[in-house]
Regions:
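Sec-dependent bacterial lipoprotein signal peptides
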Residues: 1-14
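Bacterial signal peptide processing site
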Residues: 16-20
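Signature of exported/secreted
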Residues: 25-292
């Protein structure tokens, strides 16, 4: 079993710049980091409901992945991490799909301990832009990277920003609201394809800082993932289950100010040519904060 198989799992099982969390997993956890503290949101009058709209903010996204796989009596573990500096710009007016939106990657800095081949790809990323639409619920759809090859080379940590923004009801959300969504997504990249079906439960409560109102959105979800592809020319299939929790802070004007998400996924990778199955555990954590 080669270390590259770990990266295939990462690319398939991870959502974009969103981690998922769940019960404790056997993978070695990443070193604890300082909890995300949302900065004061910009002054804005409180609205009847919070929803997304035009605006631009620069973010620091810290993403950490810990992956463990077992083959026979051998256990392989790998930790990946990076700090991603990205600017999100939402413009109007919206069309039938959503608001025209770009995510511009200014730079990516690998955490210490990230394997050299991955770190080398990461530092090459400059001015990579994803253009698409932000739908009313917050999904980033119809995304197209400015450099497909470059985007694919860092897909393990970067994803495609589909779930960067917390998912909200289409007509916005008010304090005290609760809602449930079922979301199905398909991700394709290179020789790999995966599908994910998630059930998401969310609640919104009032949040106030420095006299400015906003919302704290708590989410939990369970999901099932399946996929297939080729690793070093050899076919594989995967399936598994995962759980996730997250917290997001939204200003009253709809700006995403901070968030933290954690997930745990247990997968089985089947290698039909070799006739073996490999259990894999992946734990991911993503912290988002606004930069000045």
């Amino acid at each position: 079993m080669t270390p590259r198989l770990l990266l295939v799992v990462t690319a398939l099982a991870s959502g974009c710049a969103s981690g998922r969390a769940g019960p404790a997993a056997t993978a070695t956890p990443a070193p604890p980091s300082t909890p995300t503290t949302p900065p004061p949101p910009p002054a804005a009058p409180a609205s009847a409901s919070v929803h997304y709209g035009p605006g631009a903010l620069r973010y620091l996204v810290h993403r950490q992945l810990n992956i463990q796989q077992t083959l026979g009596d051998q256990v392989q573990a790998q930790s990946l991490g990076a700090r991603i500096f990205v600017t999100m710009a939402i413009t109007g007016p919206a069309d039938s799909v959503g608001y025209p939106t770009t995510f511009s990657i200014d730079s990516i800095v690998a955490d210490s301990g990230t394997p050299a081949p991955i770190a080398d790809n990461i530092v090459k990323v400059r001015k990579l832009v994803f253009a698409g639409r932000v739908a009313r619920r917050g999904e980033f759809v119809n995304a197209a990277p400015s450099d497909s090859a470059l985007a694919q080379s860092v897909a393990q940590l970067l994803g495609n920003f589909r779930d960067f923004l917390p998912r909200l009801p289409a007509d916005g959300v008010k304090p005290g609201a609760t809602w449930t969504d079922t979301v199905e997504t398909t991700q394709k990249g290179g020789d790999a394809t995966s599908s994910r079906r998630a059930t998401i439960h969310a609640t919104a409560t009032a949040w106030e800082r420095a006299g400015v109102s906003g919302l704290r959105v708590e989410t939990s979800q369970s999901y099932h993932v399946t996929g297939s592809g080729k690793n070093a020319g050899q076919p594989y299939e995967l399936s598994g289950e995962g759980t996730a929790t997250g917290t997001a802070f939204l200003a009253a004007d709809g700006r995403y100010m901070a968030g933290e998400v954690r997930d745990s996924t247990a997968l089985t990778i089947r290698l039909p040519v070799q006739g073996v199955s490999v259990p894999v555990v992946q734990v991911a954590r993503t912290a988002v904060s606004v930069l000045p």
